[in-house]
Amino acid sequence: MRNWKVVVITPENPFDGETEQIKKVIACGIFRLHLRHPKADEQTMRRILNGLSADERGKIVLHDHYNLVDEYNLGGAHLNGRHPELASVCSSRSCHSLAEVVASTGMRYCFLSPIFDSISKSGYASNFSDDVLRQAKKDGIINERVIALGGITVGKVQQVKEYGFGGVAILGSAWKDGIAQLDIIKQMME
């Protein structure tokens, strides 16, 4: 398989011991860790980032507080519904339609979701049929820079690869009660 990417997204709320858990996740060899705490203040984000080495910070992508990206030499910023404007430090964005994927050509990568029914968001159902995803691969819309998000489990990784995605982004599968599920993360990387 090409350069398969695994992106881990943090739970919505900061938690005790988070910095140590982030270090363990990054040590697994993931592509990026998306630090997604929409309600966290800048001081909370700084506390987390201050506990990471320079190399570890290079793997971090922020969903908020973009002013910290250059200051901490982070991996980038992620555009989302809260921050849809193009930031100069932007590297990725969330897409919920194939048209949005096509329009995201300036990004290093983008998430397409929900591919399967969400694990972490109750009632957030798959947005794409098998036929639509296979056609999008044939049309060159789904490729190495498109990351599948939503309902991703170890058992679905092979199917995601068959659709032509460049990797997976995981949230619900990656965390349980503030503990990173390192075995699952490692299996996703195979």
What are these regions (language model features)?
Residues F116-S122:
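A short acidic, helix-capping loop that chelates divalent metal ions and anchors anionic groups
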Residues A125:
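Recognition helix of helix-turn-helix/homeodomain-like DNA-binding domains
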Residues R108-F116:
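Non-cysteine beta-strand/loop elements that form the S-adenosyl-L-methionine
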Residues F128-Q135:
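Glycine-rich S-adenosyl-L-methionine
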Residues M1-H78, R82-L86, C90-Y109, Q135-K138, ...:
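Conserved N-terminal beta1-alpha1 strand-loop-helix module at the mouth
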